[in-house]
Amino acid sequence: MKNIEDSAGFPDELLARRIEYLSGFMTAERYATLCRAVDMRTRYMTVCMENTFHPQNASALVRNCEAFGVQELHAVEELCRFSPNVQIVRGTDKWIEIRKHPTTAELIGSLRGRGYRIVATTPHLDDATPETFDVAAGPFA
């Protein structure tokens, strides 16, 4: 398995420790499958959510992040606390990092401090569309 680090340069020691521990309980084939899955994970893109009122929607987002290999999910809890619904996340919350932030400003400052560009959805016509957004320009949230 490669060093668990992605193109944005963020090491993932917690995940490496989990896999090392679990490797003693699985076959070599299963271990190889797990290593391939980890090698495909990324921190180059991360997902943020803010004051999620419906925990089932936020919990579904956790599952989507895990399914698409997004290693981090950020939750702003200024008005609503985020607690994953175990019936919806189905254990996927154990494989991604959920980072909680008290305010949107703190989240943005933290991500920018780590070199992320901040991207948001907006109904404005003059902004970039997904087709014109430069994914290769650096990590984004």
Regions of interest found by a model, annotated:
Residues 1-141:
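Post-transcriptional modification and biogenesis factors for structured RNAs
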